[in-house]
């Protein structure tokens, strides 16, 4: 305890004797009585006098003996000093007004570590006409140029400031020569240079570069190079004893000035004077707390009221309460659970739970003066991860906020991230962030100065792998059109080259105003990872727990159907289960090498193998059969070849035609609607889409799937479970993440184009009088469009993963094993990739798409399904706006533009599609495919650009009911009593 100073007003019946003295004890005395006031009646009061006595540390009781030879203290002369000695020390401000111009400041210690004889000096505005003090006339200064270049390393050290919690000061530099670097340092021991550590440092930036420099002997001649005074406040860690200002790491600039340094002193009653008691829902759950934090695990989900009261010796304070909602979803589940056969085993694979906490799961509330309550769920950050938090509270007062950009490759500083100045001015490339920064706060941050994807008030966070990063904190300002990078007015720079984020740590960057600019204060906390394990269930029974790996093998069960579930067990609770149905199909993947050879030479189809083979046409008629070798001369069209070896089925589809036309035999009323070019099938053991660069459409009768392999009784039983789909049946075949839906319709009602695009399936959407097969990419959703009224279409979603349905119908499902093999051939892009040489990476094989659209036709979710199913939509092209509408005759953006803005997709709005500027920008995206819905006519230069062609989707078969978007909820072909206009698709090469 620091020695305290006591000021006493001494009142006694007689004047205090000059030799009287104060006696103090460090032990507590208990008075046993009080003298009667009558004892002093009739006495004459002496003169009031003031005395100041320094007390040693630990003093509790003082005595005032009044007689020179009577050291025994009466009880009336005892004073208890507990409250005084623990009281807060008075704040104080150093103005340097008592110091002399040209000399070291009084009551401060200076160290000239560089030894050039020029350290911190007091300057007076009365002596230098270029100087303006912040308050009064005096300041303290250190120079990096004073008639010649200097390399300063100067310390300005305060007196003992034990108990200080903050230091506020003002500084100024030469506005034309900024960059005089300085640091605020603290020492908990002594005043040697090696005793100090940095708590804050910065390099000031000026506005006007160049001009005159000034020293102790320089005449101003009317010039005022000094910058405005900038205020800084720095928090001091507990135990701080001395504070130093160090001027260093700069040369040949000019000076730095300090003035009005104010220390805020701490101090509070000792912890033993009061404690905290915590209540939940009116029940006392913890008392006797001396810390200002409390954690409780295993709290039941729902709403709870937490209250805190302070218990003093003489009583208790009123309770301060806060409502807290505990949400079970804060325990994140696993992601992307899959069940696949491997030999005779079932292998489960999944991804670790998301490291990002549930939105709003952390709550900080002020519930009284100086009292905060923080509610945060169990930690879910892995051992190799760090958490970065960006917090702000409307720093500028104008609702402009901040973004945090992190580059995991740490190679953008000095190029993308400038060393000084804004990130960019005006308009930046739409992929500036996606191409250079792997992690963003907020996650949808975009490089637009008018963006609303910012942190204004509140906080955002991201979990990153521990390691080295380049980062910057941006502040978009619409008024100036600049993407500013925040200033360095805090304890951590807002831009950094090669900063190390340690795993297991939580880094909180809090934005604040700093003088005329802003800055960030960084706080680092230990955020050690929570321990969690995985539990696996089969058909509702726990079969394995305590797993730490993201895979599990269930031996010997690949021939049976089961439901598998995985849950995450945290210290504080468990996550919801994630489940998947496993159904054996016994069919090899089409990409696996098959034990047979299939060749097509001219019109001759030859199959060689060791087993039985059959060749079918698309009407289900068997054309040829045999063992070991089958040869068939084709008459034209498509053919299915089925090979059975060791009880396993392999199916290939083949054809010999180069050009495929859509005829009346396949699709009604489509003779005027020409198809696209189809390349010749040349593969032996690959699907029939070997070559890249040609868009293929497949449309054919699939009676073979029903007549040859599925009994009518089975189809009827399946139809019973799907009453919503008119005269149809839906089956699921889980292979990877592709779903095949087999529908039987007497008349196909409004088969949606959406499935053909988003599912990457053959786009056969014309009216078909028999049966059609549609291949989806999504693994758990079935989509069926049907007419539920005279004018209304509705989309119904069927999740057919229910275990009861699959178990009771697995015999019917097994009958369609070969149907699966035929169907898999129709997937244009399997799993979002197209087939090419095996040497390329997955990223290189990703199919990229440009989307064109404008009208309400997109209510059928063409664009949404493209994005949600993982396709890389590189850009969206839409019109500038609709015609003026409403009272204000305002031009509204198209629905496509609004949706693209929501997703953060690049938007192109050309006036003229033939403009070179538009074509050049379009080429930069290098799309593999273009999809056009409800848009204007495209010139050849546009639709020929993608290597895989352009798909143009219509709401009806042209030319009848033509128009950009003829299909609207209020305006359908059914309105006119006609049924001949299902949607259509065309391909352009």
UniProtKB/Swiss-Prot annotation:
Kindly state one GO CC term assigned in the UniProt record.
Answer: cytosol
UniProt entry keywords in alphabetical sequence = Cytoplasmic vesicle, Hydrolase, Protease, Repeat, Thiol protease, Virulence
User: Spans of the sequence repeats?
Assistant: 270-323, 528-581
What EC number is given for this enzyme?
3.4.22.-
Coiled coil location: none
**Chief localization:** cytoplasm
Task: Report the InterPro entries cross-referenced here.
Answer: Cleaved_adhesin, Formyl_transf_N, Formyl_transf_N_sf, Ig-like_fold, Pept_C25_gingipain_C
Keyword Repeat on entry: yes
Q: Where is this region: Disordered?
A: 969-989
Q: Does the keyword Ribosomal protein apply?
A: no
UniProt subcellular location: Cytoplasmic vesicle
Q: Which family does it belong to?
A: Belongs to the peptidase C25 family.
Physiological role: Cleaves human complement component C3. May enable P.gingivalis to evade complement-mediated killing during the immune response. Plays an important role in soft tissue infections and is a virulence factor.
Under what name is this protein listed? Protease PrtH
Please spell out the taxonomic lineage of the organism that makes this protein: Bacteria, Pseudomonadati, Bacteroidota, Bacteroidia, Bacteroidales
């Amino acid at each position: 305890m620091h020695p305290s100073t006591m000021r006493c007003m001494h009142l006694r019946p007689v004047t205090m004797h000059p030799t009287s003295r104060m006696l103090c004890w460090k032990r507590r005395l208990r008075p046993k009585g009080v003298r009667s006031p009558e004892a002093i009646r009739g006495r004459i009061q002496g003169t009031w006098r003031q005395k100041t006595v320094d007390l040693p540390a630990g003093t509790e009781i003082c005595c005032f003996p009044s007689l020179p030879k009577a050291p025994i203290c009466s009880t009336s002369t005892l004073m208890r000093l507990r409250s005084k000695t623990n009281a807060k020390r008075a704040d104080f401000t150093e103005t340097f007004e008592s110091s002399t111009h040209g000399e070291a400041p009084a009551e401060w210690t200076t160290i000239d570590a560089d030894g050039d004889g020029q350290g911190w000096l007091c300057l007076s505005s009365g002596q230098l006409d270029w100087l303006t003090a912040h308050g009064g006339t005096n300041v303290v200064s250190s120079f990096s140029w004073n008639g010649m270049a200097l390399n300063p390393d100067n310390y300005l050290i305060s007196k003992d400031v034990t108990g200080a919690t903050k230091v506020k000061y003002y500084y100024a530099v030469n506005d034309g020569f900024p960059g005089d670097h300085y640091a605020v340092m603290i020492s908990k021991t002594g005043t040697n240079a090696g005793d100090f550590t940095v708590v804050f440092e910065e390099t000031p930036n000026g506005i006007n570069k160049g001009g005159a420099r000034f020293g102790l002997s320089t005449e101003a001649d009317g010039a005022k190079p000094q910058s405005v005074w900038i205020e800084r406040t720095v928090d001091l860690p507990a135990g701080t004893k001395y504070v130093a200002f160090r001027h260093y790491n700069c040369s040949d600039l000019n000076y730095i000035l300090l003035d009005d340094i104010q220390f805020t002193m701490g101090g509070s009653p000792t912890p033993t004077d009061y404690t905290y008691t915590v209540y939940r829902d009116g029940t006392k759950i913890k008392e006797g707390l001396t810390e200002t934090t409390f954690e409780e695990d295993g709290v039941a989900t729902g709403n709870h009221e937490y209250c805190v009261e302070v218990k003093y010796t003489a009583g208790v304070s009123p309770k301060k309460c806060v409502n807290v909602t505990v949400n079970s979803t804060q325990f994140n589940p696993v992601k992307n659970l899959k069940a696949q056969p491997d030999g005779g085993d079932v292998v489960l694979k999944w991804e670790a739970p998301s490291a990002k906490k549930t939105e709003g799961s952390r709550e900080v509330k002020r519930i009284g003066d100086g009292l905060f309550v923080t509610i945060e769920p169990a930690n879910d950050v892995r051992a190799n991860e760090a958490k970065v938090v960006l917090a702000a509270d409307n720093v500028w007062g104008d609702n402009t906020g901040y973004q945090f950009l992190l580059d995991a490759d740490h190679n953008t500083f000095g190029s993308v991230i400038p060393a000084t100045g804004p990130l960019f001015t005006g308009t930046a490339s739409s992929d500036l962030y996606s191409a250079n920064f792997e992690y963003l706060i907020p996650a949808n941050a975009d490089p637009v100065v008018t963006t609303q994807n910012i942190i204004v008030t509140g906080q955002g966070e991201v979990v990153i792998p521990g390691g080295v990063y380049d980062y910057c904190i941006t502040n978009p300002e619409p008024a100036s059109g600049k993407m500013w990078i925040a200033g360095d007015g805090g304890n951590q720079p807002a831009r950094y080259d090669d900063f190390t984020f340690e795993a297991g740590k939580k880094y909180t960057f809090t934005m604040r105003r700093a003088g005329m600019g802003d800055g960030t204060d960084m706080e680092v906390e230990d955020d050690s990872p929570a321990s969690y394990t995985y539990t696996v269930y089969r058909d509702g029974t726990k079969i394995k727990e305590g797993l730490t790996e993201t895979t599990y093998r269930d031996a010997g069960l690949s021939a049976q159907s089961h439901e598998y579930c995985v849950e995450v067990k945290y210290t504080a609770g468990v996550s919801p289960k994630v489940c998947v149905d496993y159904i054996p199909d016994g069919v090899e993947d089409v990409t696996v090498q098959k034990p047979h050879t299939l060749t097509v030479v001219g019109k001759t189809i030859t199959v060689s193998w060791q087993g039985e083979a059959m060749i079918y046409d698309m009407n289900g008629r068997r054309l040829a059969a045999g063992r070991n070798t089958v040869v068939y001369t084709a008459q034209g069209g498509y053919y299915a070849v089925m090979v059975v070896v060791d009880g396993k089925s392999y199916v290939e589809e083949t054809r010999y035609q180069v050009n495929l036309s859509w005829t009346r035999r396949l699709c009604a009323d489509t003779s005027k609607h020409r198809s696209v070019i189809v390349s010749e099938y040349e593969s032996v053991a690959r699907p029939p889409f070997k070559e890249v660069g040609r868009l293929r459409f497949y449309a054919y009768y699939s009676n073979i799937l029903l007549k040859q392999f599925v009994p009518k009784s089975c189809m009827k039983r399946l139809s019973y479970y799907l009453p919503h789909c008119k005269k149809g049946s839906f089956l699921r075949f889980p292979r990877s993440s592709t779903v095949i839906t087999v529908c039987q319709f007497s008349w196909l009602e409004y088969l949606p184009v959406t499935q053909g695009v988003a599912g990457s399936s053959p786009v056969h959407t014309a009216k078909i009088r028999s049966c059609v097969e549609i291949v989806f990419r999504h693994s758990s959703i079935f989509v069926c469009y049907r007419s539920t009224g005279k004018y209304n279409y509705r989309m119904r979603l069927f999740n057919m993963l229910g275990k009861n349905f699959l178990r009771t119908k697995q015999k019917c499902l097994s009958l369609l094993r070969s149907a699966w093999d035929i169907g898999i051939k129709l997937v244009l892009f399997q799993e979002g990739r197209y087939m090419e040489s095996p040497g390329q990476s997955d990223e290189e094989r990703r199919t990229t798409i440009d989307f064109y659209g404008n009208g309400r036709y997109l209510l059928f979710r063409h664009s949404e399904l493209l994005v949600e199913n993982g396709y890389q939509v590189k850009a969206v092209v839409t019109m500038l706006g609709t015609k003026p509408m409403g009272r204000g005759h305002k031009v509204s953006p198209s629905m496509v533009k609004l949706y693209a803005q929501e997703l953060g997709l690049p938007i192109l709005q050309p006036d003229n599609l033939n403009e070179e500027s538009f074509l050049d920008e379009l080429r930069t995206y290098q799309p593999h495919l273009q999809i056009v819905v409800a848009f204007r006519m495209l010139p050849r230069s546009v639709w020929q650009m993608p290597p895989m062609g352009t798909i143009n989707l219509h709401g009806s078969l042209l030319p009848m009911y033509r128009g950009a978007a003829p299909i609207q909820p209020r305006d359908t072909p059914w309105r006119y009593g006609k049924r001949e206009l299902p949607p259509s698709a065309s391909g352009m090469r």
